[in-house]
Each structure stands twice: as structure tokens, then as C-alpha cells.
């Protein structure tokens, strides 16, 4: 037999198990081919021997599974001469017992029974042998893949685990393996009190050099003991375990920072309540030349309303749509000489400035707090909006002529220039008290010099806290005009309310109340479509819609202020105005037929007890019957167009 290198054949039995005839067994193996069977030894009892190298005899931890140079004794010989009990050193089962056809040097091939599974001495792959009757399942385990346990790396790592576990448990008194595996990487409030109430030393010095710590998985050691200094944060109450900042870049998804909620910070400035058309109007109105390119409009919006600094880019598309589709803006020629489309300027349409200014004031009145919150410099709001009375028309109602206080039929006031149809107003009739103003109670003692400029401003601060007081005392079923306190006059009305019936009877006591304030309700008239779709904001048809609504509010048929019954919805043809005198009752028109007159309280179908006020501000004023014993008061007319109707 050809001798082999020493490193490949160094597996022998330990010293005490080495027998005296072992040297002779080695010498009796004559040289021959590697695949030829070795002759049987004369000493059958010394068959546990194997190849011996020239070096010192020592045992190695494991061998390759397909080594062709190792001779192993038969199971029956090992049973007889190598006891199964504990000895000075464990005996390892050679893989030649399971792989006989790979050139192993064994005894004669005439004894195949040695390789059967029915042997009486199964061996553990790397521990001492066990008997079949004690561990019957050991045979099946060895027959599957015994070589999987014979590599040096896994064996050494596996045998070192109990030592590290014992040391780790000394520093983790209240934690189990499940708590370490499931608790710390994903902290939550659902852990038991044992985990939450323990003081834990996350990185003890002994565990820093361990190889297989925490759940016995060496790759997980970076989750708890990183090479960088730990940055632990403890809660003030001390009732929870620390949450580590992990230094390894391989576990970015496991970083649990307590202030993680502040990373997605809320925007400091909310979205402004102004529509894009109003924001463009503000930018153009506050420009030096009155015209700006699109880029300057963007800069104005981001400077004064920081919301647009972080808003999606879709808001720029909305700005461009408003500029091109809204008639309030027009493209002007760039006088600097640039004729490209990018250099064009945008300016305000002079015919639409009044409408845009009123729209701007309306939004300021609607929610001034929200407007200022969305601005970078809230103190600049008034300067950006500008003077309300700038370039606006004259007040709606002028002062009555001096001769109006004399006796004679009531004449409607002359409308302002540019308004063809007569406007409806509230006029005092000639009464027995020449110096008495019938609206004095309404104005709480303030005697106005011009009815068209002074009105009552219904606000919670000015309105009396008690029940509404009668404005015009009426006798015998006559009607009582009441104003409901506590309802602010500036509150927006529903957007579907028709603006054509907007004969405003109440207004604030300031001459700044202008034509647009009186004619137009405070509700949204459809000029702002941002709530529907930003891409559909302020299209071309809105300019015509505004003009149509404004014309409808001025050019109407005679406004129906009084209807006698639900079945009659229109007034008869104009009749000569009746004249009432204090001694007798006033004759009032009824809906039974044209020209029919009936005394109040006569019991007809058109009695004044059924009268209703059908104006836009029916929410502010209503007519109710009063007891017949009420004292008589001055006569006041509500005059639709040229036909006054006597109420008292």
C-alpha cells in the first residue's frame, strides 16, 4: 500500500485505546493497489486499527465525508473490542461504513453484512456511541445525511453556544429570547409588564465580544450592539425600555426614533381661502406697472402665501388657466421689445376691476382669521387689498329732495346715473308729525340726514339682546315689521338664492356701503370654481354670467313685495296711490281682482293678516299680525316701482 501524506490520515484512536498489536496490523497491510481489499489480520481482536501517520497520534474534530483513505472496522468487531460506554475519548463513525464503493480499504468483500443497517452499535456522528435499544431513532438519523454535521465551522459554532448563552442570561434577568427577538426591534405598547418594567443593560461589556448572542443569531448582533456608541433615549417616567438608534446601515427600516412623527411636519401655512383669480388680482393690483409676467405672479403668491412653496406643481397650471380663460385678465404687449410668448404680460381688465375688488372684500369679511393665517406677513393684508372705495360707484340711494317732506303723493327717488330702471327704497309718508322720522326707532335714536346712506347694521354687538321690538306699530290686523337681532348682516347667504330679488332693506350705518354691496348678496355668485376643480376655475362664461346677473338685478318687473294669498302671486295693474289719514283706516289692495280695495281686517281673502314679505332678506324681516288694540302709528309705504302700497 502506498503511504499517504500525514495531514490526510491522522485519525486514530486515543492513547489508552491503542492496542499493542496495532503496529503489527499496520505492517501486515502489504503494498497494493488503492482499490484492492486489505488482507485480514491474524489478530482478529485488534481490528479497530486504522492507518497511522509518522507524526504524533492525535484526534481531529471531523473528516471529509468522501475520504477514500480511511479504514474502519466492522460493527461486530467494534461491538466486541471497543466498548460503548464512556471512555477517555469518543470514537467517531467513519463515513466508509456508509460509502463502501468509493475506494475504501476495508476487509474482504465477502462479508457484506457489515454494511447493513441492522448493526447493533449505532454511533452518534460526533459524540460517543449509543446503543440501539436506548436511542432507536439514531439509526434513521445517521442514514439520511450524516455528513451534514461533519464540517468544522458549524460544529465549533454550535458547541460554543451554551457558554455564550449562560453569560448572556446573567445580564438579562427579566428578558426571554422571545422578548429580545420580538420586543426591541419593534417597540410597541402591547408588551407585557415584565418587558416594560425592567431596567435593561442593553450593551454589557461581556457581550461585546461574543459571537452568537441574542437569539443565537450572530448576524443580529448589530441590531443591539453596534460598533458606534449607542444613543438610547429613556422615557421620563422610566416605565419603558430604551429605544436604540441603530448605527448599522443594513437595518435602516428598524430605526425607531421617538420624534419620528415630527419628521412629516405639518405645513405651517394653510392653503389660502382665496381663489386663484383673486390671488392673481392681488398680484396685478400691487404691481408697479399694473402688468406682470406669469413668473412674477408665481413669485408674488409664494412670497405672500408660503403654502405654494411646498404645494404640488398643479397650482401653476391653475394660475395659467385663470389668466387665459378669465375675462378679468387680459394679455398686453410687452413694451420691452420681446415678442415671444414667454415674455407676454398680463394685466387687469378695467371693466372687471370693481367686480374683483368686491370679491376680494367679500372673502376678507367671510373669514379674516383664515386669511391672515395663510399669509407670511399678516400685517400686509390691508395694504394688499387696498381701499375698498377705490374706483367704485356712488351709493345706491341718494338723499331725498327737499320737497319730499311736504304733502302730496309719494314719488320714487331718482336712480343713480347709468341705471335705467327705478330702484326700490323705503320712503316715509307725510304724517301728522312733521319732524318725526319713522325710522328713528329702527336706528335707536340716531336721526339720519339721508335715508339712502344710513341703515341699521345688524350685529350681535349692536342689536338689543331682548326680543325684537316692533318697528311700525299697526292697528287692527295691520302688520308689524321686525328685525331679527343676532343675525349678522354680513353672513353669507346660500349660493342658490336668486340675486334678482336683492332689494336690501337693511345695511350698515356707513356711507361706504356702495352699489355693489347693496345689489349683490354676500354669497358666492359662482365666480369661484376652485372647490369644484382647479382646472375649471374662472372660465370664459363667468364674465357673461356676472353681467347677466347684474342686469337681472337691475332690470326687473315691478318687485312684488306684498301678496295677499298663496294663490295670487302677482300684483294687479298700477293703481293711483291711496292716501291714508290718521282718523280713518287705510284702504289696501287685495288679490281678488284688479282695483278691488278692502279695509284692513274686513275678513276677505286678501286681508292684511295674510300678507307676506317676499324679498331676498325674508330671513331678516317678516310681517306678523298684531293685536287690534295696538296704537296707531305713522303711515309708511313700501313702494315697488311707481306704485306705493299703504301698510298703515
Swiss-Prot record:
Q: Does the keyword Phosphoprotein apply?
A: no
- PROSITE patterns from the entry? FORK_HEAD_2, FORK_HEAD_3
Substitution effect: residue 321 to N: In TLIND; uncertain significance
This protein's UniProt keywords: Developmental protein, Differentiation, Disease variant, DNA-binding, Hypotrichosis, Nucleus, Transcription, Transcription regulation
Q: Which GO terms describe its molecular function?
A: DNA-binding transcription activator activity, RNA polymerase II-specific; DNA-binding transcription factor activity, RNA polymerase II-specific; transcription cis-regulatory region binding
The organism's lineage is: Eukaryota, Metazoa, Chordata, Craniata, Vertebrata
Per the record, its GO cellular-component terms are: chromatin; nucleus
Q: Where in the cell is it found?
A: Nucleus
UniProt note on tissues of expression: Expressed in thymus.
Mutation: residue 320 to W; reported impact is: In TIDAND and TLIND; severely reduced transcriptional activity as shown by a transcriptional reporter assay
InterPro entries hit by this protein = FH_FOXN1, Fork_head_dom, FOXN1_4, TF_fork_head_CS_2, WH-like_DNA-bd_sf, WH_DNA-bd_sf
Q: Which Pfam families match?
A: Forkhead
The protein here is known as Forkhead box protein N1
**Associated pathology:** T-cell immunodeficiency, congenital alopecia, and nail dystrophy: A disorder characterized by the association of congenital alopecia, severe T-cell immunodeficiency, and ridging and pitting of all nails. T-cell lymphopenia, infantile, with or without nail dystrophy, autosomal dominant: An autosomal dominant disorder characterized by decreased numbers of T cells, particularly cytotoxic CD8+ T cells, and increased susceptibility to recurrent infections, mainly respiratory viral infections. Additional features may include impaired thymic development, skin abnormalities, such as atopic dermatitis, and nail dystrophy.
User: Which SMART domains does this entry report, sorted A to Z?
Assistant: FH
User: What coarse category fits the chief subcellular location reported for this protein?
Assistant: nucleus
Listed Pro residues bias regions: 58-67, 462-473
- What Gene Ontology biological process does one annotation of this record name? thymus epithelium morphogenesis
Give a short account of what the protein does.
Answer: Transcriptional regulator which regulates the development, differentiation, and function of thymic epithelial cells (TECs) both in the prenatal and postnatal thymus. Acts as a master regulator of the TECs lineage development and is required from the onset of differentiation in progenitor TECs in the developing fetus to the final differentiation steps through which TECs mature to acquire their full functionality.
Q: Is Transcription a UniProt keyword of this protein?
A: yes
Segments for region (Disordered): 1-105, 392-445, 458-508, 623-648
DNA-binding positions are 271-367
Amino acid at each position: 500500500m502506498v503511504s499517504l501524506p500525514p495531514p490526510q490520515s491522522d485519525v486514530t484512536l486515543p492513547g489508552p485505546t491503542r492496542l499493542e498489536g496495532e503496529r503489527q496490523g499496520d505492517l501486515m497491510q502489504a503494498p497494493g493497489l488503492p482499490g484492492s481489499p486489505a488482507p485480514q489480520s491474524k489478530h482478529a481482536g485488534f481490528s479497530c486499527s486504522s492507518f497511522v501517520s509518522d507524526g504524533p497520534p492525535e484526534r481531529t474534530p471531523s473528516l471529509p465525508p468522501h475520504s477514500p483513505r480511511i479504514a474502519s472496522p466492522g460493527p461486530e468487531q467494534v461491538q466486541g473490542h471497543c466498548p460503548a460506554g464512556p471512555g477517555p475519548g469518543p470514537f467517531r463513525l467513519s463515513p466508509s461504513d456508509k460509502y463502501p464503493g468509493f475506494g475504501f480499504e476495508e476487509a474482504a468483500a465477502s462479508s457484506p453484512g457489515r454494511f447493513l443497517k441492522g448493526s447493533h452499535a449505532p454511533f452518534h456522528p460526533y459524540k460517543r456511541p449509543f446503543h440501539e435499544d436506548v436511542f432507536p431513532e439514531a439509526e434513521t438519523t445517521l442514514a439520511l445525511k450524516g455528513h451534514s454535521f461533519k464540517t468544522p465551522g458549524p460544529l465549533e459554532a454550535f458547541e460554543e453556544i451554551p457558554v455564550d448563552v449562560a453569560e448572556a442570561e446573567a445580564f438579562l434577568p427579566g428578558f426571554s429570547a422571545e422578548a429580545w427577538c420580538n420586543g426591541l426591534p419593534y417597540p410597541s405598547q402591547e408588551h407585557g409588564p415584565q418587558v416594560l418594567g425592567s431596567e435593561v443593560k442593553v450593551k454589557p461589556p461581556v457581550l461585546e465580544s461574543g459571537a452568537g448572542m441574542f437569539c443565537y443569531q450572530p448576524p443580529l448582533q448589530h441590531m443591539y450592539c453596534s460598533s458606534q456608541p449607542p444613543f438610547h433615549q429613556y422615557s421620563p417616567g422610566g416605565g419603558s425600555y430604551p429605544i436604540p438608534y441603530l448605527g448599522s446601515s443594513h437595518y435602516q427600516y428598524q430605526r425607531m426614533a421617538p420624534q419620528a412623527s415630527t419628521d412629516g411636519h405639518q405645513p405651517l401655512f394653510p392653503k389660502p381661502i382665496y381663489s386663484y383669480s383673486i390671488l392673481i388680482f392681488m398680484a396685478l393690483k400691487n404691481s408697479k406697472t399694473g402688468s406682470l409676467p406669469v413668473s412674477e405672479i408665481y413669485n408674488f403668491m409664494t412670497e405672500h402665501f408660503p403654502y405654494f412653496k411646498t404645494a404640488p406643481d398643479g397650482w401653476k397650471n391653475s394660475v395659467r388657466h385663470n389668466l387665459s380663460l378669465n375675462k378679468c385678465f387680459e394679455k398686453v404687449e410687452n413694451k420691452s421689445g420681446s415678442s415671444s410668448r414667454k415674455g407676454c404680460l398680463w394685466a387687469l381688465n378695467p371693466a372687471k376691476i370693481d367686480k374683483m375688488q368686491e370679491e376680494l372684500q367679500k372673502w376678507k369679511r367671510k373669514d379674516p382669521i383664515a386669511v391672515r393665517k395663510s399669509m407670511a406677513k399678516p400685517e400686509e393684508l390691508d395694504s394688499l387689498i387696498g381701499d375698498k372705495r377705490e374706483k367704485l360707484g356712488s351709493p345706491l340711494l341718494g338723499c331725498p329732495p327737499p320737497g319730499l317732506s311736504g304733502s302730496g303723493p309719494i314719488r320714487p327717488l331718482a336712480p343713480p346715473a347709468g341705471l335705467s330702471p327705478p330702484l326700490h327704497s323705503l320712503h316715509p309718508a307725510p304724517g301728522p308729525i312733521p319732524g318725526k322720522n319713522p325710522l328713528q326707532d329702527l336706528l335707536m335714536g340716531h336721526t339720519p340726514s339721508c335715508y339712502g346712506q344710513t341703515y341699521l347694521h345688524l350685529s350681535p354687538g349692536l342689536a338689543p339682546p331682548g326680543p325684537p321690538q316692533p318697528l311700525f306699530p299697526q292697528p287692527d290686523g295691520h302688520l308689524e315689521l321686525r328685525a331679527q337681532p343676532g343675525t349678522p348682516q354680513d353672513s353669507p347667504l346660500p349660493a342658490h338664492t336668486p340675486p334678482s330679488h336683492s332689494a336690501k332693506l337693511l345695511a350698515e350705518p356707513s356711507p361706504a356701503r356702495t352699489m355693489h354691496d347693496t345689489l349683490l348678496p354676500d354669497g358666492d355668485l359662482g365666480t369661484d370654481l376652485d372647490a369644484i376643480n382647479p382646472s375649471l376655475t374662472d372660465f370664459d362664461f363667468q364674465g357673461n354670467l356676472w353681467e347677466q346677473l347684474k342686469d337681472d338685478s337691475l332690470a326687473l318687473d315691478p318687485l312684488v313685495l306684498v301678496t295677499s294669498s298663496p294663490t295670487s302671486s302677482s300684483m294687479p295693474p298700477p293703481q293711483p296711490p291711496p292716501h291714508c289719514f290718521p282718523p280713518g283706516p287705510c284702504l289696501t289692495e287685495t288679490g281678488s281682482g284688479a282695483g278691488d280695495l278692502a279695509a284692513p281686517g274686513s275678513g276677505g281673502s286678501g286681508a292684511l293678516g295674510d300678507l307676506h314679505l317676499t324679498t331676498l332678506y325674508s330671513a331678516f324681516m317678516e310681517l306678523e299680525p298684531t293685536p287690534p288694540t295696538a296704537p296707531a302709528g305713522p303711515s309708511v309705504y313700501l313702494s315697488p316701482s311707481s306704485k306705493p302700497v299703504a301698510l298703515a
